[in-house]
Swiss-Prot record:
EC number: 6.3.2.9
The entry's keywords: ATP-binding, Cell cycle, Cell division, Cell shape, Cell wall biogenesis/degradation, Cytoplasm, Ligase, Nucleotide-binding, Peptidoglycan synthesis
Gene Ontology BP, a term: cell division
Pfam families cross-referenced by the UniProt entry: Mur_ligase_C (PF02875), Mur_ligase_M (PF08245)
PANTHER family, A to Z: UDP-N-ACETYLMURAMOYLALANINE--D-GLUTAMATE LIGASE
Catalytic reactions on record: UDP-N-acetyl-alpha-D-muramoyl-L-alanine + D-glutamate + ATP = UDP-N-acetyl-alpha-D-muramoyl-L-alanyl-D-glutamate + ADP + phosphate + H(+)
Name listed for the protein in its UniProt record: UDP-N-acetylmuramoylalanine--D-glutamate ligase
Biological role stated in the UniProt entry: Cell wall formation. Catalyzes the addition of glutamate to the nucleotide precursor UDP-N-acetylmuramoyl-L-alanine (UMA).
Binding site residues for ATP: 136-142
Cellular component GO terms, alphabetical: cytoplasm
Length: 502
């Protein structure tokens, strides 16, 4: 077996069909891989200490031989098992004992994205699909959904896969069983998934932005950027021209990208190698051929995009640039953006009442995401705090200080956040919520924010921190924010404009 980097589709498919394959992890990704390998008739060893019982019905779909092992048993017997390939769930670190042991035995280790892409490109499920890959520190889900909408509006059989929902391996297996085929996979891919996919080469790839994140997993920011950069091996790379770290990463890898995007005028930011840039001119989203102003294509209005603000506009520009790389018609881009509504917890307006807008951006779980959520806004009552996980907030406060009218802080690391706000913005009103019960805390947040807000203000939940200190996840945090916004803003009348959550 060749090295993981050199693993080719035909070789990988032959291994999946005729050799023993070990699957590490039984989460969403692991279950998707199992269903795909079952469709291929693989000999499987599933390693999982949890959720193994949920997999029994999957093996009934074919003649697959499936053996279940605990992690410790798999480590002890790995040499005896002699798998020719290990497919790991994305969260498993390279130094995990099982994966480290596989490396010692020179067994190739790949992830769920790589396994699905290799099988698909080898023709295991019919004509290979077109893959578009979206990654970045923030904005991946919104951009993936926007891009999928544009492709569908253009008449393409497109499906959003990866972190946004269905695992691509599960989608391949489902279509193998007779469900409608998708010819285009729009994949939201994480740095973890890309680490385990060194051979992955999508048709179109884009890094939306880069900031320090998941350093405990990757070991350094350089490693994190290197894993993200895997999408830039695409046949057509799209560069985020407003993000210096993305451009630095691309230059370090000598990426030649003919396409890019910006939220500014395309001619003002285009790099020397970029030929076509999507950007904003005269209130319109346009695609410009650099150096030839006569070749400007109008795409859509730059106003009214969901989510509002620069972050939403950047996602729309990225989506449009990737769509244009596949030849999507301008009318389809405009129609998709006109009908697009951001998913819950990603800049969703949950209430407009009394001239005050309440915005749920609970997904902003790190300082970079919070900065993106608040950039360009004014008169903001900022709801922030939770688990900072060691992240510094001084740069964030410096960047968004001009947008803030007041701060309501909660969560286990609220003191650190409040201290930095007080140091940089000593005159800014700050309310500290000491409650640790999730409902009580968010009830107090909404009460305080309602008391501070005046017509023309926005109350924005953009925590800059993880949620697990009090909440089951960012979804519960956002749901409770919306619930108590309605309660304290007095929006129980029938004519209130509360947007449907979903």
């Amino acid at each position: 077996m060749e090295s993981t980097h050199a693993l080719q589709p035909a070789e990988a498919l032959e291994t999946m069909r005729s050799q023993t394959v070990l699957v590490a992890g039984a989460g969403v990704a692991g279950r998707g891989v199992i269903s795909m390998l079952c469709a291929l008739g693989a000999r499987l060893v599933l390693v999982a200490d949890d959720n193994a019982q949920a997999l029994g019905h999957i093996a009934d779909d074919g003649d697959t031989e499936l053996r279940l092992l605990s992690v410790s048993d798999a480590i002890d017997t790995l040499e005896e098992l002699a798998p020719q390939l290990v497919v790991t769930s994305p969260g498993w670190k390279p130094e995990s004992p099982l994966l480290a042991r596989a490396a010692e035995l020179n067994i190739p280790v790949i992830g769920d994205i790589a396994a699905a892409w290799l099988a698909d490109q080898a023709g295991a499920f019919g004509q290979p699909r077109t893959w578009l890959a979206v990654t970045g520190t923030n904005g991946k889900t919104t951009t993936t959904a926007m891009l999928t909408s544009m492709l569908i509006a253009d008449g393409r059989a497109a499906l959003a896969v990866g972190n946004i929902g269905i695992a691509p391996s599960a989608a391949l297996a489902a279509q193998h069983r007779g469900e409608p085929r998708s010819d285009v996979f729009v994949a939201e891919v994480s740095s973890f998934q890309l680490h385990w996919a060194p051979m992955f080469k999508p048709t179109v790839g884009c890094i939306l932005n880069l900031a320090e994140d998941h350093l405990d997993w990757h070991g350094s920011y350089e490693n994190y950027c290197a894993d993200k950069a895997q999408v830039l091996t695409a046949e057509e790379s799209v560069l985020a021209l407003d993000d210096d770290d993305v451009l630095t990463t691309a230059r370090a890898r000598e990426v030649v990208a003919r396409r890019g995007y910006t939220i500014h005028d395309p001619e003002e930011v285009a790099s020397q190698n970029t030929e076509r840039v999507v950007g904003v001119r005269d209130g319109r989203l346009v695609e410009v051929v650099i150096g030839d102003p006569s070749q400007t294509t109008d795409l859509a209005p730059a106003q009214g995009i969901s989510p509002p603000g620069p972050a939403g506009l950047a996602d729309a520009a990225a989506s449009a640039a990737m769509a244009r790389a596949l030849g999507v018609a301008p009318g389809a881009i405009e129609a998709a953006l006109a009908g697009f509504k951001v998913q819950a917890h990603r800049g969703q307006v949950v209430l407009e009442h009394g001239g005050v807008t309440w915005i749920d951006n609970s997904k902003a779980t790190n300082p970079h995401a919070a900065e993106a959520a608040l950039r360009g806004q004014r008169n903001v009552i900022w709801v922030a705090g939770g688990q900072l996980k060691g992240a510094a907030v001084d740069g964030l406060i410096r960047a968004i200080g001009g947008a803030l009218k007041a701060v309501v802080a909660l969560g286990v690391d609220r003191a650190e956040l409040v201290a930095e706000v007080s140091r940089q913005l000593p005159d800014l009103p700050v309310t500290v919520i000491d409650a640790t019960d999730p409902e009580e805390a968010m009830r107090a947040v909404a009460r305080a924010a309602h008391g501070l807000a005046q017509p023309g203000d926005s109350v924005v939940l953009a925590p800059a921190a993880a949620s697990l200190d009090m909440y089951t996840g960012m979804s519960q945090r956002g749901d409770l924010f919306a619930q108590y916004a309605v309660a304290y803003a007095g929006a129980d009348r029938a004519d209130e404009r509360t947007q449907e959550r979903g």
